[in-house]
From Swiss-Prot:
EC number, as in UniProt: 6.1.1.15
Family according to the record: Belongs to the class-II aminoacyl-tRNA synthetase family. ProS type 1 subfamily.
Catalytic function, reaction form: tRNA(Pro) + L-proline + ATP = L-prolyl-tRNA(Pro) + AMP + diphosphate
PANTHER family: MITOCHONDRIAL RIBOSOME PROTEIN L39/PROLYL-TRNA LIGASE FAMILY MEMBER, PROLINE--TRNA LIGASE
Keyword Ligase belongs to the record: yes
A GO CC term assigned to this protein in UniProt: cytosol
UniProt source species: Mycobacterium avium (strain 104)
Protein name: Proline--tRNA ligase
General function of this protein: Catalyzes the attachment of proline to tRNA(Pro) in a two-step reaction: proline is first activated by ATP to form Pro-AMP and then transferred to the acceptor end of tRNA(Pro). As ProRS can inadvertently accommodate and process non-cognate amino acids such as alanine and cysteine, to avoid such errors it has two additional distinct editing activities against alanine. One activity is designated as 'pretransfer' editing and involves the tRNA(Pro)-independent hydrolysis of activated Ala-AMP.
Keyword annotations from UniProtKB, A to Z: Aminoacyl-tRNA synthetase, ATP-binding, Cytoplasm, Ligase, Nucleotide-binding, Protein biosynthesis
Gene: proS
Lineage: Bacteria, Bacillati, Actinomycetota, Actinomycetes, Mycobacteriales
Oligomer status and interactors: Homodimer.
Record-linked InterPro entries: aa-tRNA-synt_IIb, aa-tRNA-synth_II, aa-tRNA-synth_II/BPL/LPL, Anticodon-bd, Anticodon-bd_dom_sf, Pro-tRNA-ligase_IIa, Pro-tRNA-synth_IIa_bac-type, Pro-tRNA-Synthase_IIa_type1
GO MF annotation terms: aminoacyl-tRNA deacylase activity; ATP binding; proline-tRNA ligase activity
Name of a matching Pfam family: tRNA-synt_2b
Length: 582
């Protein structure tokens, strides 16, 4: 197929959009692949849609290869199925809800576990019908509070979501493994650099869960890995290496001290090192207590205290994952006024216990560890408060930040952190959704068998931005051949009529060989055409320029930055096609 730029719906921009933050956003706008409509909403213009469709094609091929069958559900979904799984409430403000003219509630689908489960239940009733693997590629909707980074975080996006249904856990694990391998093949074909990390399931539910993160400095997800062992996990899923408990017998008694105006960890440590305690005190020796209000879906607000070493900050993502599906907020001044037993800056475990406040601590707070913490009075702290002797928590929580150098949970070495963009997430859901809808089939022994389920998502439209992030230079985009909008960008950089005719004939010859050609036949200067060719990012550029009179054209490799000359003649199109094939 030949597409003429003189007829293509395209306008490139020389300057970056004022609101663009990341390279992919800047380049996809400048190159005319997408255009903004509203915050978090984008239109796909012809070039962008071609890239999107090529990614979809690769995803379909790999899903079909593992036995997937494509279907399509509506994006507008009724309330009832989501009530059955409690996700109507659990999703909170992150979904778009609406009513029809009769007052019936609907949402714009963020994901479709409920509909897939109900459909399979309605169609199949015997173990002989399984396993089943269904998928769709469809628009999804989430009411992002802060859409950002172009099409990386939006309110409408294209996603491939697939669902496996099996009669036993062995079948589920096989389907999960098949998807894991299929995704690795997809990302290899897309030339995306990625890492597979352990993850949390969140509102999706289930047990085993892994994310595929594309390595990128603009990624919103922080992950850690151990270079010695290959362990990798999203920070939300990291399990803190828990020290062994220590005996409490023989430890000095806790002593309350007047510490003056020391409401922060820094001021407390400064006091401790001037108080003659007989040792150097660091923030890691202190226990700070953070107060929250938490509310389960449909419930009331309750107080929750979290204790963690003073040298650690609370990681909002880890805290949110640990409390899922509850929502939470930090206490404000009005809350502290409402609970006078909470002395801000001097909170200790005693007042929490005496007033029935649930208290969860970091896994490093084990029996036998000694701490400096609040004494529940202004200007007073207690030194030598021993866990397991002087206070006991109600449990542990993974809410503290994870740092470079922390020990890996597998004990193999230190952790190092990096940033990534989530491009896929796979879950072994188990029976959460089939339990909600009593999705049973008749087993081989004639008794009911509850189906078990897997869910496997892949961000198709996000992948366009991810590839742009990983494959660009200072001149513009550099699409891998597997997803590029065209195979060859043929630039006519010569006003000579014979050269133009020769370029048109070359485009026809390439078309007959199955090469998709973008022919720049515009009445524009060579400089403008070259800048656009570099910006658009088609992997191969053929220039019909001044060398045409000498019997040569230029072939430029957009990835390698190399240029070579090819002789004109009957074999020119075949020579170019051979270069494309490598």
């Amino acid at each position: 197929m030949i597409t003429r730029m003189s007829q293509l719906f395209l306008r490139t921009l020389r300057d970056d959009p004022a609101d663009a933050e990341v390279p992919s956003h800047k380049l996809l706008i400048r190159a005319g692949y997408i255009r903004p409509v509203a915050p978090g909403l984008y239109s796909w213009l012809p070039l962008g849609l071609r890239v999107l469709r090529r990614i979809e094609h690769i995803v379909r091929e790999e899903m079909n290869a593992i036995g997937g069958q494509e279907i399509l559900f509506p994006a507008l979904l009724p309330r009832a199925p989501y009530e059955a799984t409690n996700r109507w409430t659990e999703y909170g403000d992150s979904v778009f809800r609406l009513q029809d003219r009769r007052g019936n509630d609907y949402l714009l689908g963020p994901t479709h576990e409920e509909l897939f489960t109900l459909t399979v239940k309605g169609e199949y009733s015997s173990y002989k019908d399984f396993p089943v693997l269904l998928y769709q590629i469809q628009n999804k909707y989430r009411d992002e509070a802060r859409p950002r980074a172009g099409i990386l975080r939006v309110r409408e996006f294209v996603m491939k979501d697939s669902y496996s249904f099996d009669i036993d856990d062995a079948g589920l694990k096989a389907a999960y493994h098949a998807h894991r391998e299929a995704y690795q093949r997809i990302f290899a074909r897309l030339q995306v650099r990625y890492v597979i990390v352990s993850a949390v399931s969140g509102a999706m539910g289930g047990s085993a869960s892994e994310e595929f993160l594309a390595e990128s400095p603009v990624g919103e997800d922080t992950f850690v890995r151990c270079l010695e062992s290959g362990y990798a996990a999203n920070v939300e899923a990291v399990i803190t290496a828990r020290p062994d408990p220590q005996p409490v017998e023989g430890l000095p008694e806790a002593v309350v001290h007047d510490t003056g105006d020391t409401p922060t960890i820094a001021t407390l440590v400064d006091w401790a090192n001037r108080a003659g305690l007989g040792r150097t005190v660091t923030a890691a020796d202190t226990l700070k207590n953070v107060l929250l209000k938490v509310r389960q879906p449909g419930g009331d607000w309750e107080l929750l205290a979290i204790g963690l070493p003073g040298d650690r900050e609370v990681d909002d993502k880890r805290l949110g994952a640990a409390l899922e599906p509850a929502e939470y907020v930090l206490l404000d001044d009005a809350d502290f006024a409402r609970y006078p037993f909470l002395v801000k800056g001097y909170i200790g475990p005693k007042a929490l216990k005496d007033n029935g406040v649930r208290y969860l601590v970091d896994p490093r707070v084990v029996d036998g560890t000694s701490w400096i913490t609040g004494a529940d009075e202004p200007g007073r702290h207690v030194v030598g408060l021993v866990a397991g002797r002087d206070f006991t928590a109600d449990g542990t929580i993974e809410a503290a930040e994870v740092r470079d150098g922390d020990p890996s949970p597998d004990g193999a070495g230190p952790l190092v952190s990096a940033r990534g963009i989530e491009v896929a997430h796979i879950f072994q859901l188990g029976r959460k959704y089939t339990d909600a809808f009593t999705a049973d089939v008749l087993g081989e022994d004639g008794k009911p068998v509850r189906l078990t389920m897997g869910s496997y998502g892949l961000g198709v439209s996000r992948m366009v931005a991810v590839i742009a992030e990983q494959h660009h230079d200072e001149l513009g985009l550099r699409w891998p051949a597997s997803v590029a909008p065209f195979d060859v960008h043929l630039v006519i950089a010569n006003k000579d009529a014979q050269a133009r005719a020769g370029a048109t004939a070359l485009a026809d010859d390439l078309d007959r060989l199955g090469v998709e050609v973008l022919l720049d036949d515009r009445q524009a200067s060579p400089g403008v055409k070259f800048k656009d060719a570099e910006l658009l990012g088609v992997p191969w550029i053929v220039v019909v320029g001044r060398g045409w009179a000498d019997g040569v054209v230029e072939l430029r490799d957009r990835f390698a930055g190399q240029t070579r000359e090819l002789a004109t003649g009957p074999s020119l199109a075949a020579d170019i096609a051979a270069a494309l094939r490598g």
